[in-house]
Amino acid sequence: MSEFKYISLLQKVLATGTVRNNARNMKTKSVFGEKLVSNAEKESFPLLTTKKMYWNGIVSELNWFMKGGVDSRILQKQNVHIWDGNTSREYLDSRGLKKYEVGECGPIYGFQWRRSGARYIGMYHNYENEGVDQLQTCVDLIKKEPESRRIIVSAWNPIQLPEMCLPPCHILYQWYVNTQKGTLDCQMYQRSADLFLGLPFNIASTALLNCIIAEITGLKSNTISIVIGDAHIYENQFKAVEEQIGRPPMKYPRLKFKNKITGIDTWSKDDIEILEYLSHPAIKVPMVS
């Protein structure tokens, strides 16, 4: 995915998007049914350059997801505050989650990835051997049944949606192994994409997830595809988006593993680094929560 494709999507939504009201009491412009594709054989790591990206937050959040995290205070200790707004006392109460402690997310992404089907008892409960470890199952299938069409992780659990501080946006991942080339592709479906704040994060996170799974399974990360349902821009982002559109993209950086990653639980952000990342300055707009 060249950055120009992302910029073109921003332009399309601003120019032709349908004006809609949403549950967060802020109008959006949106389109439906978009797809972005990134080919690792032709491009480097897709970390956007038209604004400075929050790399520490991207890596830390993915590590937290992959380890089944449900306590946002773990991220806070790493100076990552992207979940603070959705786990504040006021916000949790507005979701009817008055019994949750501040920082408690409920059975969100990480829980579904690693403990799917388990009953959510709280963030202090030991969920070992409870539920289905979807992520590890995918790693095992890639190694043992690489041509399986069931290499899938889903975060969409209708029964537990009311227990989540935020229903999942990126809800499904599917992997495809090309056994002849030794490559790994990933397609992600995202029901809702905040194109300015959320999607750049999701693009990098999906690419990083595929790189890590490829590293664990001895494959080469290849194509990532992101299919988007509701692709929207909030009205408080319009000026910022116009500023970003006016910036020329730079060359993507490179991703390097400093240490060999052998399992989904055994890596840390210190094992990964981004090289040669040049970007325009950050553009800050408050997150709508």
Which role fits each region the language model picked out?
Residues 1-289:
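Terminal, non-catalytic protein-protein interaction segments that mediate quaternary/complex assembly
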